């Protein structure tokens, strides 16, 4: 298995160093649900601004304030504790009376707005996130500037970030131990984290191998292609390669890589043979995913940050803004810009 730090770069290894998250204000995340509250219903959507507290902690505090069980408060995704983040929480509070959430007080947390909603907010039910990052002590401004320009055109690898694998790779190590011993894992959270780490690591490896090709965005026979921004995909055939390549170049279509699991992977012929070869030695993790009935899926191989802009405060400090779809990692963008000694594993997805 390729170590995360050794995964192939799309733009080559960065020439300079820098600091990510010298303080929480250097990492700002604003959640984009992609819809507005209904204005009625048995649930209440609450938009919060937080700094220094994790999502679950705030959700539990909100449940206590509303005098409801903690399981009645949900959210679309975990947001980093050591960052400034805006996100929505959802509390099930039936009845016509609206609680006064302006009275909710928690250090490091502020209620920005709230409204009634018809449906529970479920994990993953968001469109994406807007990021504002500040990189400090940048040692090579020219290199970072050119990389930002290149990313606008070519994107970055859509790797799962180090945070998916746990601090020190603990989630992936747990998956490997589980695969080797076949001992039942009763803890639902551990099961989820370990299985997610296993398929994410296999996906990263397949993408890393594909990036070693001279033209990483070259459509090959049997590739599974996805309409940009959609989940559905179809298989490329030899007769269509020229037209499909044009649409990939226009970023209308995206080449995908497999999230291994049970069932067919989706690719065929040349593309399938390539994916199978890329993870041929990782039989234990593949067997684990099949055994635990984790279904195979597809994910775009490259990621194109939307609304990408940047501003140099001085020669060693740059503020970068961009929007990413749900499930993608800001740290995968930063990785293509600078070498940093910071540990990404503590940054929530």
Swiss-Prot record:
Gene3D superfamilies: TruD, catalytic domain, TruD, insertion domain. The active site is at residue 80. This is tRNA pseudouridine synthase D. PROSITE patterns: TRUD, UPF0024. Belongs to the pseudouridine synthase TruD family. CDD domains: PseudoU_synth_EcTruD. InterPro entries: PsdUridine_synth_cat_dom_sf, PsdUridine_synth_TruD, PsdUridine_synth_TruD_CS, PsdUridine_synth_TruD_insert, TruD_catalytic, TruD_insert_sf, TruD_pseudoU_synthase. It is an enzyme of class 5 (isomerase). The keyword tRNA processing applies. Substrate binds at residues 27, 129, 329. Signal peptide: none annotated. It comes from Escherichia coli O81 (strain ED1a). GO terms for molecular function: RNA binding; tRNA pseudouridine(13) synthase activity. Residues 155-303 form the TRUD domain. Its EC number is 5.4.99.27.
